[in-house]
Amino acid sequence: MIAKHVPMRSLGKSDFAGLANYITDAQSKDHRLGHVQATNCEAGSIQDAITEVLATQHTNTRAKGDKTYHLIVSFRAGEQPSADTLRAIEERICVGLGYGEHQRISAVHNDTDNLHIHIAINKIHPTRHTMHEPYYPHRALAELCTALERDYGLERDNHEPRKRGAEGRAADMERHAGVESLVGWIKRECLDEIKGAQSWQELHQVMRDNGMELRVRANGLVFEAGDGTMVKASTVARDLSKPSLEARLGPFEASPERQAQTTAKRQYRKDPIRLRVNTVELYAKYKAEQQSLTTARAQALERARHRKDRLIEAAKRSNRLRRATIKVVGEGRANKKLLYAQASKALRSEIQAINKQFQQERTALYAEHSRRTWADWLKKEAQHGGADALAALRAREAAQGLKGNTIRGEGQAKPGHAPAVDNITKKGTIIFRAGMSAVRDDGDRLQVSREATREGLQEALRLAMQRYGNRITVNGTVEFKAQMIRAAVDSQLPITFTDPALESRRQALLNKENTHERTERPEHRGRTGRGAGGPGQRPAADQHATGAAAVARAGDGRPAAGRGDRADAGLHAATVHRKPDVGRLGRKPPPQSQHRLRALSELGVVRIAGGSEVLLPRDVPRHVEQQGTQPDHALRRGISRPGTGVGQTPPGVAAADKYIAEREAKRLKGFDIPKHSRYTAGDGALTFQGTRTIEGQALALLKRGDEVMVMPIDQATARRLTRIAVGRDAVSITAKGSIKTSKGRSR
């Protein structure tokens, strides 16, 4: 793991609210945002916590430095610590830096190849109102990371900084922007030539041959490229500092001002870092787009502005017509005055809506036509379906492939419907949405998120088969392999595991499932049609079995022939509606539990026993011999009727139905009330709309589209939901039925 402080270069741009809003913004991605929490804040929501932090910062008027501390904690690719581990790591790091009592907002991000935590810390103490600045934070963070890796079993990183200052920033630029820095170019192209110079004249000639110039700047030396980019000589190598060179070559000698113009053998340009694929055409397209960016943005803004002006003019024209109509048909001075006021208010509202729409369009245009680095441009092209851009991202040195719990396919691919793409990282990893889970694809293997559901695992198997082939290789923990075997059996996909042990286990479970289904399905045994080769008949060996054996095979204490065509009538229904809790093969239920109709709900059935069913086996209890009218309480599904507790509606469902009926009745009368219904799982985002209490039962209101879903909850959940902002916070329902906010909180 790596913990890094991100300083704000310009003090005037320091803004805790902007930082907190950025780290808690989902950016229209389902799997970008993980757990979000506010620590040492009294507020119940993130926006209120931001206001509380800003108020605390305003109490300190003497501090001149940055009052916000931005910290990033990143983990190795493939590491997925649990939520409790992440919270413990955050707490220990903040305490180690001296910010244990300070207000902070943190968010877990999953939209890159490395799981990471953003922590926005208020440097102003909430009670003392003094500003705290950590002492040697890089050293403290390195020691904390080493201890945390040891305590939580994380993969070890080297926390000794190998690059400092400008050299480290140049390396960051190459990694994140994908553009070659001057420091990196010198090291790769001409560092040996520079170190091999034996005099100042020879050193100046080497500089000219490589399109650079050696100059004195302040108390040191700098290398200046032809485009004006400069770097300190000591940043390139410690033995190229001015004292080191003077000790080796003597006192510094400047280059003669007049030199014959020589053609440089090579020259530094801000070109992309060399990749394993050819990116000449892509980079030419990138440069052309960046050069025409300003013109294209101005043209798009002009079109949007003309469209806004036309809409405003149309609104004013409509308003003038309305006022003219009022002038002609209006009766009475007071009535006309009221109508004129309504017309003016409607015009102002319409113009405000038009201006708001224009502001949104302008923001989107600036975002679309903003200048991007080479790596960001490749990412945008890949998101729009550019296969060459995606291949270039995957060819970068930073792209090292997925690790941890992964699956890969081999063989003949079977293209099919692919799930929606949530994001593409700068390493070329595609993040797919699979229900509540995320599936990552790096072009070679797939990785499933830690909180993957059974549906997510099945979707990963289906995706691997469609994109790579039906021979599946599973790598990871024993638990993950067991989950993939279970998902393969449940999905019934035509795949094969390359690991013989996994494949044998899958075959065993599959055979067990098929055997279990055959025992649940009624056998087709009619009185007629038992000729050779007839459908549903038994093997010849079974036809010569004894009567006792035939009764045992029937499994219900009756001869197989006595079942007659009643088995034929129920064959199709039993195939569609599988009966639950069926015993093992050969086990017969007690007589009082026979003839149940589990596939039918809440139906009173009277059955007249056939002649073949009057004789009972001797092991039947005596109270069954003289059968009279028996109550139907033994039916597996309860019967709703007065005086019995079986089949009663649960209180939560009854309260929800009552509330829905009351709201629907008002809606049908013309009230402006959205449609209400019980909560059902489905696609679409849910927005929290508040809670209600009906007959002592708490209900949660969740809005999906234009419909309000009503869900029964307990009192503890209702109390916790009071901290969620009504109408603003998005929520989701977990597989266990609990409410989870988009910020990661489970209710």
Curated annotation (Swiss-Prot):
Record organism: Escherichia coli
Stretches for region Disordered: 510-594, 624-652
Keyword Cell membrane included in the entry's annotation: no
Gene name linked to the record: traI
InterPro entries: Endonuclease_MobA/VirD2, LPD7, TraI-like_C, TraI/MobA_relaxases, TraI_M
Function as written in the Swiss-Prot or TrEMBL entry: The initiation process of transfer DNA synthesis requires the interaction of at least three plasmid-specific components (TraH, TraI, and TraJ) at the transfer origin resulting in the assembly of a specialized nucleoprotein complex - the relaxosome. Site and strand specific cleavage at the transfer origin is dependent on TraI and TraJ.
Protein name, UniProt field: Protein TraI
Keyword Amino-acid biosynthesis included in the entry's annotation: no
Compositional bias annotation for Basic and acidic residues: 513-526
Key words, A-Z: Conjugation, Plasmid
Record's compositionally biased regions (Low complexity): 537-562
